[in-house]
């Protein structure tokens, strides 16, 4: 019986940048903040971490630093996805080598593929390492959806243990046809409770960058049986979540963190600063929630 890598809230942590590269001192501070506030897992070098703008050397260095800084206090899941299967294998092997607890692998994007191609892509990655693999399905970004029947096939591979699912419409089918020890995590902060109600085990969250404790509570209250309290927390956070996705993520969450005094720097191009109008909406929302 495979155990979940984590249950609860994992943070899809941002990567703080300066003009010269990664701000490792700040990254260390953010990691300590997350662990202190009760986060259940740290997911590094994902979409929110802007891995797509990192050269391999930097990408690998961030994974290594995070693993060493966390030092087994919570599971570290390293984003190692690529639309080049061999490249994804290389990054995944490195993550395993430096001690990551699992890898997160997004579907190939731009060149896309067929469902058979998806199966072969993830199968080769999984066979190249021994640590657990979390599939990442985000069709709104990649233009490619892992169909439930393909997820079921992949879930039969021993170390493909979970999926971060952003297509909420197929969560029920995935959970109903996959093995009971296959874990489903929400990839949408506004749909955590619905996913948990269907049998999911947690969320890989953007909003946890600024409210890790509350994000943990959102999931923990549900899993502890207090569904009504979890529902109330989910609804209470909707306006904040809306503001955090008013522009392409992670633009707003980084802006929010800077407004909160965390000094995480800007996003890298092609991501740009928020429009003045949206920035003011975000700022007012943070004030409404008592975050600034």
From Swiss-Prot:
The keyword ATP-binding does not apply. InterPro entries: Aldolase_TIM, DapA, DapA-like, Schiff_base-form_aldolases_AS, Schiff_base-form_aldolases_CS. The active site is at 136 (proton donor/acceptor), 164 (schiff-base intermediate with substrate). GO terms for biological process: diaminopimelate biosynthetic process; lysine biosynthetic process via diaminopimelate. Pfam families: DHDPS. The record marks 47, 110 as: Part of a proton relay during catalysis. Catalyzes the condensation of (S)-aspartate-beta-semialdehyde [(S)-ASA] and pyruvate to 4-hydroxy-tetrahydrodipicolinate (HTPA). Homotetramer; dimer of dimers. This is 4-hydroxy-tetrahydrodipicolinate synthase. It comes from Acetivibrio thermocellus (strain ATCC 27405 / DSM 1237 / JCM 9322 / NBRC 103400 / NCIMB 10682 / NRRL B-4536 / VPI 7372). The lineage of its organism: Bacteria, Bacillati, Bacillota, Clostridia, Eubacteriales. The gene is dapA.
């Amino acid at each position: 019986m495979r155990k979940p890598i984590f249950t609860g809230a994992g943070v899809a942590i941002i990567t703080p940048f300066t003009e010269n590269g990664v701000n490792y001192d700040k990254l260390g501070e953010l990691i300590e903040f997350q662990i202190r506030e009760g986060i259940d897992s740290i997911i590094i070098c994902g979409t929110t971490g802007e891995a797509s703008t990192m050269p391999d050397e930097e990408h690998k260095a961030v994974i290594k630093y995070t693993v060493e800084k966390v030092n087994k206090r919570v599971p570290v899941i390293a984003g190692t996805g690529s639309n080049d299967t061999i490249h994804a294998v290389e990054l995944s092997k490195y993550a395993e080598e430096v001690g990551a607890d699992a890898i997160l692998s997004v579907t190939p994007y731009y060149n896309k593929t067929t469902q058979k191609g998806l199966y072969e892509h993830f199968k080769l990655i999984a066979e190249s390492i021994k640590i657990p693999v979390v599939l990442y399905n985000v069709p709104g970004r990649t233009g490619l959806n892992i169909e439930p029947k393909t997820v079921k096939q992949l879930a039969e591979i021993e170390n493909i243990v979970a999926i971060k699912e952003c297509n909420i419409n197929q969560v029920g089918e995935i959970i109903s046809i996959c093995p009971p020890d296959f874990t489903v995590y929400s990839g949408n902060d506004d749909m955590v409770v619905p996913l948990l109600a269907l049998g999911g085990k947690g969320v890989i969250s953007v909003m946890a960058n600024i409210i890790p404790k509350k994000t943990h509570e959102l999931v923990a209250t549900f899993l502890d049986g207090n569904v009504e309290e979890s529902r109330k927390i989910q609804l209470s956070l909707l306006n904040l979540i809306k503001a955090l996705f008013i522009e392409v993520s992670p633009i707003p969450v980084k802006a929010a963190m800077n407004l909160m005094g965390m000094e995480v720097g800007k996003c890298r191009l092609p991501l740009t600063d928020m429009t003045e109008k949206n920035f003011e909406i975000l700022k007012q929302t943070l004030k409404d929630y008592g975050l600034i």
